[in-house]
């Protein structure tokens, strides 16, 4: 893919307003509340802000989420300057690997954004629910299929590679979701809302602690459902019902923390998300729904092989026959973390995680040449006869991650030393529903970094870092049972250096340079659709993406 040089230049950024004279800037042993606090450089302080090394960072706190009643992560992110959220519009869910049906986030036009929960990456190195191949999108996760909103304490938006900890491939930036933990005093909430089109939302949260406060717990559950949505057609000027846009989504989150003493703590978290969503793909074009136009569309498609609205005007109306089409995803993610130290705001811990994600759905009745003109009396009878239920499956895909993460932080004089190492084993399973055969792809990775945040003065710090990335080759098993390997194992070290300087309590400047590295992913090779018993010389020419990023603000 060759080297690319990315430069983002900004006018000197001044902190908005004066700094709070009562703000606490020391991070040692700090218990960060929902109150807004800033460090000496004007950066928002969060539970994990110390790992950042400067840059354009904005934080969405729980008060903002609750007051504005955001129902999805994308709803909150789209109000951040420079952040764009692409959604299918009108319906939820999404077909696995089909970019246009997913919610994708980009920062300053770059979709290579890493999404984390409590500092841990949530993507899978061999499977991509958002895009089966790189030409579809460089995004690697659906932003609205990560964690329930009731479980979110804060959302950090880091534009550009603002911290070495988050990986050498985060060229666009990082979104770090920080989850809630139990309160010292028992507190619970019940939430209910209703709206047009049979929309309902039921939510419940409860948190508290034991008598000593050492054991804390948090629990959240929510169900959201809706019937078919309605919309105004700008072309015809009429209002219509958008059929097959209903959904039923469930979230369940639980977290338990036990504090042995000031240095040792054990935390367990569980995150469940499930979407059971109708699938319309796109809205009809009512200009082409007469008997004559419908028959022309079918003839051009089935007999003359004309695809797309340019060659076959009204082509998208063919999807109306996908009666009963749906997409379902089911996610169950676990984390167990043991904290064994905290020094100058830096946690030392060891974490085990396990992710299980399942995606399946159907295209309903599919493309049907025998279908009568939609929304006519003849159509109603035909639709009732040919509607498919949830028992039909057109695709079935599973993603699994299992890994171990170790972090250690130590302050030595003016040096704050921090290192993190993560071993991850990612697996992808694709099942041929009709033949009941399964292909799989597997890849191991080790990602690590060493960072030294040097406090030169009270107003100036510089942070050099080295990042290590190891990716194994792809181990594959085809649907025919053929075992093979593709690609090659790679080990890369990428440096970075970031500095920030505070002129006074109202103005600061930051600058940084980093080498970026994005490994070839399974979608680049398109391995999941390749006959592994034969070679692919075209794929062999692909190279990992490398380059430089310079930031100034």
Annotate the PLM regions.
Residues 73-76, 103-106, 116, 142-145, ...:
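N-terminal periplasmic accessory domains that precede
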Residues 104, 120-159:
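Short acidic/polar hinge/loop motifs at secondary-structure boundaries
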């Amino acid at each position: 893919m060759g080297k690319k040089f990315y430069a983002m230049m900004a006018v000197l950024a001044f902190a908005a307003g004066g700094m709070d004279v009562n703000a606490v800037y020391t991070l040692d042993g700090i218990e960060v509340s929902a109150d807004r606090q800033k460090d000496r450089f004007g950066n928002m302080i969060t539970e994990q802000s110390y790992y950042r090394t400067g840059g354009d960072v904005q934080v969405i706190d729980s008060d903002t989420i609750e007051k504005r009643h955001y129902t999805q992560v994308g709803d909150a992110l789209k109000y951040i300057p420079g952040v764009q959220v692409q959604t299918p519009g009108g319906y939820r869910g999404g077909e696995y690997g089909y970019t246009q049906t997913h919610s994708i986030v980009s920062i300053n036009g770059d979709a290579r954004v890493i999404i984390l929960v409590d500092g841990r990456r949530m993507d899978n190195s061999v499977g991509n629910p958002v895009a089966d191949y790189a030409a579809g999108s460089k995004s690697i996760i659906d932003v609205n299929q990560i964690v329930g909103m009731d479980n979110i304490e804060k959302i950090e938006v880091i534009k550009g590679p603002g911290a070495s900890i988050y990986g050498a491939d985060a060229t666009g930036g990082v979104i770090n979701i920080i989850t809630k933990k139990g309160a010292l005093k028992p507190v619970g909430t019940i939430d209910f809302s209703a709206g047009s089109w049979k929309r309902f939302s039921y939510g419940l949260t409860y948190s508290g602690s034991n008598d000593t406060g050492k054991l804390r717990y948090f629990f959240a559950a929510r169900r959201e459902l809706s019937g078919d949505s309605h919309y105004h057609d700008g072309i015809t000027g009429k209002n219509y019902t958008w059929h097959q846009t209903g959904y039923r989504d469930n979230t369940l989150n639980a977290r338990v923390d036990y504090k042995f003493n000031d240095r040792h703590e054990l935390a367990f978290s569980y995150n469940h998300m499930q979407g059971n969503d109708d699938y319309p793909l796109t809205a009809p074009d009512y200009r082409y729904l007469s008997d004559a136009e419908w028959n022309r569309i079918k003839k051009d498609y089935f007999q003359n092989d004309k695809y797309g609205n340019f060659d076959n005007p009204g082509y998208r109306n063919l999807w109306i026959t996908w009666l009963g089409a749906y997409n379902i995803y089911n996610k169950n993610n676990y984390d167990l973390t043991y904290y064994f130290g905290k020094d100058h705001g830096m946690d030392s811990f060891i974490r085990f995680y396990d992710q299980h994600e399942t995606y399946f759905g159907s295209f309903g009745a599919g493309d049907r040449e025998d279908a009568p003109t939609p929304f006519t009396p003849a159509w109603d009878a035909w639709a009732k006869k040919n509607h498919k239920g949830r028992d039909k499956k057109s695709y079935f895909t599973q993603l699994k991650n299992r890994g171990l993460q170790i972090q250690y932080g130590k302050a030595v004089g003016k040096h704050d030393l921090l290192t993190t190492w993560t071993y991850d084993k990612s697996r992808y399973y694709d099942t041929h529903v009709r033949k009941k055969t399964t292909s799989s792809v597997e890849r191991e990775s080790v990602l690590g970094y060493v960072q030294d945040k040097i406090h030169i003065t009270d107003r100036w710090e510089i942070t050099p870092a080295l990042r290590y990335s190891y990716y194994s080759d792809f181990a594959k098993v085809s649907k025919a049972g053929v075992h093979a390997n593709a690609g090659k194992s790679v080990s890369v070290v990428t440096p970075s250096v970031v500095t920030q300087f505070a002129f006074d309590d109202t103005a600061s400047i930051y600058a940084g340079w980093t080498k970026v590295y994005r490994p070839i992913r399974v979608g680049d090779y398109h391995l999941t659709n390749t006959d592994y018993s034969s070679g692919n010389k075209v794929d062999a020419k692909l190279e990992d993406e490398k380059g430089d990023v310079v930031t100034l603000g």
